[in-house]
């Protein structure tokens, strides 16, 4: 028994560290030593400054101090509005997910937000934030990632996340890799718990902590009918008494395959259905409704059916959310009982 346990533990470590190394190296393989940057911003600033100076000088010569003041106020207001609009246009994506399972539970509903921190033609550095409450556990997610576009018609990226179950005091880190092209997304994620065994809020006389694991995902769309999409995912977690499906059905080293279909009539709304099948004939079905708002796009474009095809392109999915499991999967262990010694 001990030999089998050691073999499983060794295999688990090999798989997890192989995933981490691949995910760290993935975007670096296509990342050049230096990113090119143009002088466009400097030239624009100089042009704006010249326009402002010329307008003020003209007003001062023709109408005096009051007119110059009004002109300066108008130009400053216009410039401020332009700056705010440009700043907002570089914000990425906000998504509200309404998720109901086959038991009528809405616990997996969530809010996620991605914002670029640095953005140019060939790369984007971004942060992603999220909040959700699966099984009544308020969980926050914060991540940092990079996406590169140096290979024609492909995006290669990597990310790191910190997940925190504020209610149950469980924490973990995650590493991810992405490879996207037009109408196709591939990704892989590794999850590693950082908190140790502690009192469980789900069971009396039990301890709990995050289970280590990984998943591999693929999502694709039909070029001839981009509103329809399909996805496939394989996931594996390690440990005894792991709640991959829920806390009432615990399994040892569980794995599962998920298949799903989704329909996007307009870029703003996506409806989906997922079916997950695991060991011991465990399965579940989930229905989801996502409201996906791109802050860099107009309202008209987000309710236009013609814009769905653009969303499926590599350029249109530049600020899409990272595809990962933001819910912390837990494992449980019964507390050791101490026997009283009679003298």
Task: Report each predicted region and the residues it spans.
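N-terminal secretory signal peptides that target proteins for export/translocation
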Residues: 1-11
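Outer membrane beta-barrel translocator domains of Type V secretion systems
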Residues: 60-165
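Residues that define the transmembrane beta-barrel architecture of outer-membrane proteins
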Residues: 90-92, 105-111, 135-142, 154, ...
């Amino acid at each position: 028994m001990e030999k089998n346990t050691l073999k499983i533990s060794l295999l688990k470590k090999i798989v997890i560290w192989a995933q981490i190394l691949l995910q760290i190296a993935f975007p670096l393989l296509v990342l050049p030593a230096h990113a090119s940057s143009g002088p466009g911003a400097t030239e624009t600033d100089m042009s704006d400054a010249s326009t402002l100076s010329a307008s003020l000088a003209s007003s001062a010569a023709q109408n005096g101090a009051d007119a110059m003041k009004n002109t300066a106020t108008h130009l400053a207001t216009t410039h401020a509005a332009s700056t705010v609009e440009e700043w907002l246009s570089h914000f990425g994506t906000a998504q509200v997910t309404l998720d109901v399972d086959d038991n009528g539970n809405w616990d997996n509903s969530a809010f996620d937000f991605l914002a670029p921190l640095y953005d140019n033609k060939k790369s984007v550095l971004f942060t992603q934030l999220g909040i959700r409450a699966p099984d009544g556990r308020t969980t926050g997610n914060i991540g940092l990632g990079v996406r590169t576009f140096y290979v024609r018609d492909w995006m290669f990226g990597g990310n790191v996340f910190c997940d925190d179950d504020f209610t149950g005091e469980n924490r973990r880190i995650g590493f991810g890799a992405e490879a996207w092209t037009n109408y196709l997304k591939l990704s892989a994620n590794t999850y590693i718990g950082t908190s140790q065994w502690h009192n469980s809020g789900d069971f009396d006389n039990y301890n709990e902590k995050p289970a280590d694991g990984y998943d591999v995902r693929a999502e694709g769309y039909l070029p001839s009918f981009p509103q329809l999409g399909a996805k496939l995912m394989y996931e594996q977690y390690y440990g005894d008494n792991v709640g991959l499906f829920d806390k009432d059905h615990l399994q040892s080293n569980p794995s599962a395959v998920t298949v799903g279909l989704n329909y996007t009539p307009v870029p703003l709304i996506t409806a989906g259905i997922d079916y997950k099948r695991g060991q011991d004939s465990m399965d579940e079905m989930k229905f989801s409704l996502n409201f996906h708002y791109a802050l860099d796009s107009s309202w008209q474009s987000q309710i236009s059916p013609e814009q769905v095809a653009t969303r499926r392109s590599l350029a249109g999915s530049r600020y899409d959310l990272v595809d990962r499991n933001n819910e912390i999967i837990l494992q449980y262990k019964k507390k050791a009982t101490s026997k009283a010694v009679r003298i």
